[in-house]
Design a protein with these regions (language model features):
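Acidic, metal-coordinating catalytic segment for phosphate/diphosphate chemistry
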Residues: 2-53
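A short coil-to-beta-strand element that immediately follows conserved catalytic motifs
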Residues: 22-23, 104-113
Length: 183
């Protein structure tokens, strides 16, 4: 299948048989997906919902907090992100993520938008979060920086587009940086 993403799931979660690419009739016509040849289970490979936050620190002159993930090479700073937990709403999830990753007290939030991130097979649900308090990073983050709105730079994918939309809604013309190619 041309352009098919690489799959991490290799075995059926019901019977442990090795999965195979099998074409089968679906509502929209025939579709080739990873399926179990023994029991018929289908690995749908649906996009994962990811939460992201433009964190505006109200006790730091409304500067925006960007952080660098400890696993990332170089000095790229981005929005606070994380996965929803079972049983929580997206607003609850982003408040939890911001507090877990930065120790900030979340005061309010509003939806910026929903963005595709095809490379990671994710759907990003982005919020503007107002917060305050001392910043203490979780081990998953290496460092953070606070930026005035005019000093923020966006990137042309995923959460960078959410940051650009947030800036535009506040009357700023987003400035973009070019990220190095992924190797």
């Amino acid at each position: 299948m041309s352009g098919a993403p690489s799959y991490e799931t290799r075995f059926c979660s019901h019977c442990a048989t090795a999965l195979a690419m099998v074409e089968q009739a679906e509502d929209g016509g025939p579709k080739t997906r990873l399926r179990c040849p023994a029991c018929g289970w289908t690995h749908w490979n649906n996009p994962t919902p990811v939460l992201a936050a433009v964190v505006e620190c109200v006790d730091q002159g409304n500067q925006v907090l960007l952080a660098r993930n400890a696993a990332w090479p170089g000095r790229l700073f981005a929005l606070i992100t994380g996965f929803m937990e079972a049983g929580e709403t997206a607003p609850e999830g982003i408040a939890r993520e911001v507090t877990e990753e930065t120790s900030l007290q979340v005061l309010g939030q509003s939806l910026i938008g929903v963005y595709e991130f095809k490379r990671m097979n994710q759907i990003i649900i982005a919020y503007h979060v107002t917060a305050r308090g001392p910043i203490s990073l979780s081990p998953e983050l290496a460092e953070y920086k606070l930026f005035a709105h005019a000093d923020l730079r966006c990137w042309r994918a995923g959460t960078g587009l959410a940051l650009a939309d947030w800036l535009t809604a506040r009357g700023h013309v987003p400035q973009f940086i070019e990220l190095p190619p992924r190797t």
